[in-house]
């Protein structure tokens, strides 16, 4: 038995969906432990492109328990759309489970998210406008609505009274928006609750039962390390904890239950929205990476900012997550480049530093110090073994592993499942040196 956490080692969009889908074959239970519909992952199966925001990637395999954990925030309207999409594609959803204590994104959360972001003007943080931040804020203020509340009319009417009164006051007096009606929301969300009721479970009990029965559990994070509320580039972060420690809180398990942590990183770096980005590129190479990598957000459709691989944030991700190994994705996007650069340190006010400054003002001043490597200028899309890779591609991967001081277990060379080199299965394989 092995319990594995999959995290993003950059600013999200690293390709965690594909890696989680790949590892789900060896897992019995797949748990999404934080975030909401602000995250998105794309999986390509038999030329079918499936885009999911809440449902764990393991749903595409039969006989898997796929659990949306207590640390998530759930927009039931979008969740039901995902369920319908999967049913339309003849995918069995009987293994889908939803924590009764997950908090629910309500209509006023989405409206407030958009209004607050617009009000920030030039100081906007780049929110997706899906209501995630306001939902987590209500959770922290003990003013939130949980999935269990959608299963009882009187309960829902009771718990919604205070937050709706507060939110209507904000909508009317601050933003000049028409207030929402209690009955409209209650009826709509009771309907959602009824449709979702057969999936609702006690999250912690479900996971601990699986663990007791020696099942393999895969914990799936959303977003990435640099978007972590406490350890990311604050305030340009998400409202939850995507790092590996967040799996324990969001799923309701102790750290001793985690056997291994795998980080997912692109062979270059991307970021969506606002905030400092030391290795960001401009011009033709930026456009080339964006176009070849299809760098447009699954959730928002926004064009992603592209840059060279940043080893400083990579080493930071290794540290704060306790990474055991790494999955490098989109290596094929670099195929046509004759020269590739990797950031090995920063220049901060004339001083060379090799650590990640968590102060966004300092990070904004950091200038990348690069190491140049030779490109391979040939396609890697059909490589299925390390021996198939061009020598310079191998050199590049080894350099990343040495720089980050963590072995590489998986290399992804395209969107399809089979466009992958699995050096070692992090769930069933022994802990040993992989590609260094």
Curated annotation (Swiss-Prot):
Binds 1 Mg(2+) ion per subunit. The keyword Secreted does not apply. GO terms for biological process: 'de novo' AMP biosynthetic process; IMP metabolic process. PROSITE patterns: ADENYLOSUCCIN_SYN_1, ADENYLOSUCCIN_SYN_2. It catalyses: IMP + L-aspartate + GTP = N(6)-(1,2-dicarboxyethyl)-AMP + GDP + phosphate + 2 H(+). SMART domains: Adenylsucc_synt. The keyword Cytoplasm applies. GO terms for cellular component: cytoplasm. It comes from the Bacteria. InterPro entries: Adenylosuccin_syn_GTP-bd, Adenylosuccin_syn_Lys_AS, Adenylosuccinate_synth_dom1, Adenylosuccinate_synth_dom2, Adenylosuccinate_synth_dom3, Adenylosuccinate_synthetase, P-loop_NTPase. GO terms for molecular function: adenylosuccinate synthase activity; GTP binding; magnesium ion binding. Plays an important role in the de novo pathway of purine nucleotide biosynthesis. Catalyzes the first committed step in the biosynthesis of AMP from IMP. This is Adenylosuccinate synthetase.
